[in-house]
Regions:
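Ferredoxin-type iron-sulfur electron-transfer modules in oxidoreductases and energy-metabolism complexes
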Residues: 281-309, 324-441, 500
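Intrinsic disorder at enzyme termini
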Residues: 6-34, 44, 402, 408-500
Length: 500
C-alpha cells in the first residue's frame, strides 16, 4: 500500500463514505469517546498550554538543527551496536530493507504498527519478493486479513464492528467462536504467538529516536511491539528523518502529550526504549539491529513554508476533533494519512497532480489547531495549499473562469449592486411562498451541490447598505431626541430649583 490507496476522484470517495451509515456511527462514537477522555485529562493538567508551547519549541529546535541531531542519533546508535542506513527516497528504503532480508535469508517477518512502513508500501513490496509480513497489532492484523485500508492513524480498524471481525476471521482463519472481543483476542493471540516465536526478523516503527542515547522508542497498548522488537534475532527499525528528540527529558514532555492526545489516557499499555543489540548476559533482545532513517521528501518540506508540519507526532488528535473527518470518514481522503494532518501532509509527499482537491476537504474551523499538542497551524497550512493549487494552475478552466468572473463582479460596486438587485426578485419568483430554495431547485447551476443537502433562504429585497443607512439614521435621530429631552429636563430642573 502506498500513500494514496484510492485513486478515485475526491467527490466519488466522499459519496461512498456518506452512504456508509456504520462508518458514520463508528467515527462519531470514537470521536466523542476519545475527545471526551482527552478533554478530561487535559483539564487535570494546570499548565497544559505551557506543555504544548514547550513541545512545539522542542520540535522546532530539532528541525532547525536536524542535521546535528540525526548525526548524533546515528553515531550513538552505532555505538550501541546498531547498523544505521540513510534512505533518501521510499524506493531506497525498500531496497535497503530487502538487502537485509536477503542477507539473513529470511522469508517472513512480524511487524508492529508503523505509519512509515505504510508510507513506503513495505508490505506490498515484501510480498512481491516472496516475503510474508505478518501484522501483529490487533487492528492492523484485521486490516491486513481483510485486504483493507486503514481509516485512522491510531485506530486503523475503526470501520469494523465485532460481528464483521468475527465473520472475517471465520472466513479467512477458520475462527469458530463468537463475536465477543475477548474471545476474538484470545484467538488472535493463539494465532500470532507462533509467528513471534518463529519469525527471523521483527520490523517496527519508531515513535521517537533519542539523539543523546541512540535509543528507539515504541508506544503500544497491546505489547506486540515489545515482542516484535525483542524475540526475533534481527530487528529492523524504520523511522522518518524528523522523528528525533534531543534527550530523555524532551522525550518525557512528548510522551505526556502523545498518549493523552491520541487515546485520552495518562500512559500507554506498553512503552519501550530500545538501545542497541542484545548484550552479553542479557536473556532477550535482538542480536542484530538495523535502523533505516527515511527522508522521502522531508528535507524539501523543511525548506519551505510547510515546515511546521514536521512537528507532527502522529497522535491523531486533529482527526478526532474534525467535523469533515466525522462526515467523510478516513476513507474519504483516499490516503493513509487522513484528517487535517493528512490534508496537509499527503500533497507534500505525492504532489498536487493527485491531490489538488484534497485541501478543500476542510471547513477551516480551526479546531484541529486548538487540540494539536505541538501547535501545528493546520488551517494556515491548508489555506497555503489552496493558494498553491490555484497559483500553480491545478484548477479547471471552468472553475478558474467562474472565480475570475466572481472577482470582477464583487470588486465592482455598480456590477455587484445590479446583480444583487436582480437576484432578490428572481429568487422569490423561483421559491414562491416558501422563501427558500430546496432540493426541488437542484437544477440551478453552481447552487445544486449546496441545495442537494441543505436549504438556502432567499435574498432580502432590501440591501444591507440601505438597511444599515436607515438603521444608522434612526439611531442618530434617537440620540438627538434623547439629547434634546435631556436638555429640556435639565432646564426644567434648574427652573424648579430657582422657584424653590
Amino acid at each position: 500500500m502506498s500513500i494514496i490507496y484510492d485513486d478515485a476522484p475526491l467527490e466519488d470517495r466522499i459519496h461512498r463514505a456518506l452512504s456508509d451509515t456504520f462508518k458514520h456511527r463508528a467515527i462519531e462514537t470514537a470521536q466523542d469517546v476519545i475527545t471526551g477522555k482527552r478533554d478530561a485529562l487535559v483539564a487535570e493538567v494546570d499548565n497544559w498550554e505551557d506543555f504544548r508551547t514547550h513541545a512545539a519549541a522542542i520540535r522546532d529546535h530539532v528541525l532547525e538543527n536536524l542535521d546535528y541531531y540525526v548525526r548524533q542519533f546515528a553515531t550513538n546508535a552505532q555505538k550501541n551496536g546498531a547498523q544505521v542506513y540513510f534512505a533518501p527516497t521510499d524506493n531506497d528504503a525498500l531496497d535497503c530493507i530487502l538487502d537485509i532480508f536477503e542477507a539473513e535469508g529470511a522469508k517472513s517477518c512480524v511487524k508492529s504498527k508503523s505509519m512509515m512502513t505504510e508510507e513506503i508500501g513495505l508490505n506490498t513490496f515484501l510480498e512481491s519478493h516472496g516475503i510474508k509480513p505478518v501484522e501483529t497489532d490487533c487492528a492492523e492484523h484485521i486490516i491486513q486479513t481483510a485486504g483493507n485500508a486503514p481509516s485512522h492513524i491510531v485506530v486503523p480498524a475503526l470501520h469494523f464492528d465485532r460481528t464483521s471481525i468475527r465473520n472475517l476471521y471465520h472466513e479467512q482463519k477458520g475462527y469458530e467462536g463468537t463475536n465477543d472481543p475477548e474471545e476474538i483476542t484470545r484467538f488472535l493471540r493463539k494465532t500470532l504467538r507462533p509467528e513471534f516465536m518463529n519469525a527471523p526478523i521483527g520490523v517496527t516503527g519508531c515513535n521517537f529516536g533519542v539523539a543523546e542515547t541512540g535509543s528507539c522508542t515504541l508506544v503500544s497498548n497491546e505489547g506486540n511491539a515489545r515482542m516484535a522488537s525483542s524475540i526475533p534475532e534481527t530487528q529492523i527499525v524504520v523511522m522518518g528523518t524528523e522523528r528525533i528528540v534531543p534527550d530523555l527529558r524532551s522525550l518525557d514532555v512528548m510522551m505526556k502529550l502523545l498518549v493523552r492526545s491520541a487515546v485520552g489516557a495518562k500512559i500507554s499499555g506498553s512503552f519501550s526504549i530500545n538501545t542497541g543489540c542484545r548484550r552479553e548476559g542479557e536473556a532477550d533482545g535482538p542480536k542484530n539491529v538495523h535502523i533505516v532513517i527515511v527522508n522521502n521528501g522531508r528535507t524539501d518540506i523543511l525548506a519551505h513554508e510547510f515546515r511546521p508540519m514536521l512537528r507532527c507526532i502522529r497522535c491523531g488528535a486533529c482527526m478526532n476533533s474534525c467535523p469533515v473527518y466525522r462526515h467523510i470518514t478516513g476513507h474519504g481522503y483516499g490516503s493513509i494519512y487522513p484528517g487535517p494532518m493528512g490534508v496537509v501532509l499527503t500533497p507534500l509527499l505525492v504532489g498536487y497532480e493527485k491531490t489538488a482537491k484534497l485541501p478543500y476537504a476542510c471547513s477551516l474551523c480551526g479546531q484541529c489547531a486548538e487540540v494539536c499538542p505541538v501547535k501545528v497551524p493546520l488551517p494556515n497550512l491548508i489555506s497555503q495549499h489552496r493558494r498553491n493549487v490555484v497559483s500553480q494552475g491545478y484548477v479547471s478552466p471552468v472553475e478558474k473562469a467562474i472565480f475570475t468572473a466572481a472577482a470582477a463582479t464583487f470588486s465592482n460596486r455598480v456590477t455587484y449592486g445590479a446583480l444583487t438587485a436582480a437576484a432578490a426578485p428572481a429568487m422569490k419568483l423561483m421559491t414562491g411562498k416558501t422563501n427558500q430554495l430546496d432540493r426541488g431547485s437542484t437544477w440551478i447551476p453552481v447552487l445544486n451541490g449546496w441545495l442537494a443537502s441543505r436549504n438556502l433562504d432567499t435574498m432580502s429585497s432590501k440591501k444591507f447598505r440601505s438597511w444599515f443607512a436607515e438603521h444608522k439614521k434612526q439611531e442618530e435621530e434617537q440620540k438627538r431626541a434623547e439629547t434634546a429631552q435631556a436638555l429640556t429636563d435639565a432646564c426644567r430642573n434648574n427652573a424648579n430649583r430657582e422657584e424653590n
